[in-house]
Amino acid sequence: TEHSTGTEGVMSMSNMAMMVGKLGREGCGVNPLRGQNNVQGACDMGAQPNVYPGYQKVTDPAVREKFEKAWGVKLDPNIGTHATDVFPKAITGEIKGLYIYGEDPVVTDPDTTHIIKALKSLDFFVLQELFMTETAQYADVILPGVSYAEKEGTFTNTERRVQRVRK
């Protein structure tokens, strides 16, 4: 799905599967691969602007209250900024600072010129990374990162299989 027309590609594959009767039947369907490692796990854990862990909606007062109590903080009732809107908002000045960890959008984004323009538009940009990437050229501060092999945790793949990672 990590392609300038990835969404359209997945929709086209889904439409073709539906046309030939391969949706809603056992052993059939479309399973597009996600663009980055552990995207599924991050989404499951609430790393999206519209949901908390377990895909519980931030706009639901009862859900928000539950997480406020568990986390001991007051939470914003509004949906946050989607990842695809961050760089356009940096260009317009709506986002003034950015912290990127473990990603090289200058290389991985389909529109490099757009990303560079956005990074240059920021007042302050922090990058945490293992290596000096193309994106690092635009950072005000570069912090050292750690690789998956240097920490413990889990990855959740596209089929929702959780894999444990040990040092």
Could you tell me what each predicted segment is?
Residues 1-26, 32-167:
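Non-catalytic alpha/beta scaffold blocks inside enzyme catalytic domains
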